């Protein structure tokens, strides 16, 4: 894909906002979709300003425009979009079209609020709206045309606010068959905050730090009972034990993993959860190194079984008191809601997208959970995207680069003449 398009492609995620130009392979900006204010400061930091190396994210007050997947704060969203469009992309909306990735089942009132923001406050000349599953399917079909000759797939989007299993046929999402779990990256971060606060330090106000710790340290277990047994071992023999250092505001302003090798020890374990034996020299060395380790300070916390119990929410939420089906059951229900002729094809084309699918071993665990629920004569094939955070944006970039793209858009003059509801009919929402 090559650049040069006058179309701004905006994937307005609840956690990260991805923005760039139609025809480009990668977005120009991938920034937090929020505003934050440091303790004792009156200045709000917006989007990319939170990513600066000299910014201490400890104890920040957050304001997010998106809650549970939907736009709830138009003022914050305008601030973020203004920052991204004018400062990072450096474009004039009056001379640009916008392709916006919008959440599924967006209520009409929120569609109208979005259109107001796009046309009246930012002044884009035209707008096209698409949902994430159809764009993810479009991108994967362009990469592997032979695999997607049937023109259908099941897109599993494990995002920041929710998880959707969405069948797609000929680039249209089959809304009647979509199944949703009210679990996403935000819920996992909140659960990790609760576990750490109960067992170690009070980190309930450290959303950005714990989000970073979750992304760097959590993984999906292939054998939860076996891993729980290993997690009870002493510190030297515990393959899951690792420390996360909190910023002190002076020496370092970002949190980090204390020992990356220690954090990756679990990856050498066999899948059946058996402990890896150590010879005497390894044991002696570990004892010697353990003596050299400093005592746990107020600026760090230790994780053990939390590392795999947090992602476990996605597979067995009922074990944690949530009255919801797990991810595998959600996928099966979505496929079973489709025509019987589509079902075997969908099981062979399950696409994983969204940041929560980046946990190590996610794909293997999902296949292990899914196989017993699928008829024996059906094949199960799971496609993990190379960069699941950018999947929807890249599909949008492809769509925006098509010659007929402008015919899919509603223009500002059409919006002013007919209003939001009549214009929206063009998008089949």
UniProtKB/Swiss-Prot annotation:
Signal peptide: none annotated. It is found in: Nucleus. GO terms for cellular component: Swr1 complex. Residues 275-293 have a biased composition (Basic and acidic residues). InterPro entries: Actin, ATPase_NBD. Residues 272-293 are annotated as: Disordered. Keywords: Chromatin regulator, Developmental protein, Nucleus, Plant defense. Pfam families: Actin. One of its GO terms (molecular function) is nucleosome binding. Belongs to the actin family. ARP6 subfamily. Component of the SWR1 complex which mediates the ATP-dependent exchange of histone H2A for the H2A variant H2A.F/Z leading to transcriptional regulation of selected genes by chromatin remodeling. Involved in several developmental processes. May be involved in the regulation of pathogenesis-related proteins (PRs). This is Actin-related protein 6. The lineage of its organism: Eukaryota, Viridiplantae, Streptophyta, Embryophyta, Tracheophyta.
């Amino acid at each position: 894909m090559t650049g040069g398009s006058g179309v701004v492609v905006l994937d307005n995620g609840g956690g990260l906002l991805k923005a760039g130009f139609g025809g480009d392979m990668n977005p120009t900006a991938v920034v937090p979709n929020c505003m934050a204010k440091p303790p004792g400061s009156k200045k709000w930091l917006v989007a990319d300003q939170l990513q600066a190396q000299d910014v201490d994210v400890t104890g920040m007050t957050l304001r997010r425009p998106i809650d549970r997947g939907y736009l709830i704060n138009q003022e914050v969203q305008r601030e973020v979009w203004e920052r991204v469009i004018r400062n990072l992309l450096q474009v004039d909306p009056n001379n640009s079209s916008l392709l916006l990735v919008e959440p599924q089942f967006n209520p009409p009132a929120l569609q109208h609020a979005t259109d107001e923001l796009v046309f009246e406050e930012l002044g884009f000349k035209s707008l096209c709206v698409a949902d994430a599953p159809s764009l993810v399917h479009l991108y994967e079909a362009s990469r592997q045309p032979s695999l997607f000759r049937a023109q259908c797939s099941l897109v599993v989007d494990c995002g920041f606010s929710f998880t959707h299993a969405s069948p797609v046929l000929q680039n249209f999402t089959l809304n009647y068959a979509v199944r949703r779990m009210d679990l996403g990256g935000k819920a996992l971060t909140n659960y990790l905050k609760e576990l750490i606060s109960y067992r170690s330090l009070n980190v309930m106000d450290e959303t950005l730090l714990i989000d970073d710790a979750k992304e760097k340290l959590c993984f999906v277990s292939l054998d939860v009972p076996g891993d729980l047994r290993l997690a009870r071992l002493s510190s030297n023999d515990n393959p899951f034990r690792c420390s996360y250092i909190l910023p002190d505001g002076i020496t370092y302003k970002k949190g980090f993993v204390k020992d990356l090798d220690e954090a990756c020890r679990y990856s050498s374990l066999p899948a059946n959860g058996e402990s890896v034996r150590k010879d005497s020299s390894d044991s002696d060395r570990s004892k010697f190194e353990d003596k050299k380790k400093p005592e746990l300070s107020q600026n760090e916390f230790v994780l053990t079984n939390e590392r795999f119990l947090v992602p476990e929410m996605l597979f067995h939420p009922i074990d944690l008191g949530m009255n919801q089906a797990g991810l595998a059951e959600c996928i099966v229900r979505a496929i079973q809601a489709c025509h019987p002729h589509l079902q075997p094809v969908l099981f062979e084309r399950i696409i994983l997208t969204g940041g929560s699918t980046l946990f190590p071993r996610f794909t293997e665990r999902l296949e292990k959970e899914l196989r017993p629920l699928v008829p024996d004569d059906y094949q199960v094939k799971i496609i993990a995207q190379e960069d699941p955070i950018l999947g929807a944006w890249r599909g949008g970039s492809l769509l925006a680069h098509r010659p007929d793209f402008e015919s899919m858009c509603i223009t500002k003059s059409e919006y002013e003449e007919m209003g939001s509801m009549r214009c929206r009919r063009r998008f089949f929402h």
